[in-house]
Amino acid sequence: MAKAANTAAQRARKKVRKNVADGIAHVHASFNNTIITITDRQGNALSWATSGGQGFKGSRKSTPFAAQVAAESAGRVAQDQGIKNLEVRIKGPGPGRESAVRALNNLGIKIQLIEDVTPVPHNGCRPPKRRRI
């Protein structure tokens, strides 16, 4: 019984406000969704948001507007943690790449660097077959 009360207290614990000035925004833009994670320089997550988590479902998750809303959400939480400068690392070919970066810039966060870290195979795995529509 005491263990159940202990876990409830852990869940209700207030988020610790970190005072971090510089961070890294990892934007993972796939064809189906966009995931934005803002970390400190060591890689510890400060905030994150997804297009699907912002209420967009189905094909609307993969729109640039959904990526913009997700980036604004993650950026606001990161600003509360003290983030002022960001490096942006973009991964993936999705439609939310540019709009996520613009949304972070419009929040007043200074973007120092934009880097594309999309993994490119050196002729590794066989790709999926072409779609016939």
Swiss-Prot record:
Domain of life of the organism in this record?
A: Bacteria
Coiled coil regions, renumbered to chain: none
Annotated GO biological process: translation
The record's keywords, sorted A to Z, are: Ribonucleoprotein, Ribosomal protein, RNA-binding, rRNA-binding
Q: Which InterPro entries match?
A: Ribosomal_uS11, Ribosomal_uS11_bac-type, Ribosomal_uS11_CS, Ribosomal_uS11_sf
- Known partners and oligomeric status: Part of the 30S ribosomal subunit. Interacts with proteins S7 and S18. Binds to IF-3.
Q: What does this protein do?
A: Located on the platform of the 30S subunit, it bridges several disparate RNA helices of the 16S rRNA. Forms part of the Shine-Dalgarno cleft in the 70S ribosome.
Family recorded in the similarity comment: Belongs to the universal ribosomal protein uS11 family.
Name this polypeptide is given: Small ribosomal subunit protein uS11
Gene encoding this polypeptide? rpsK
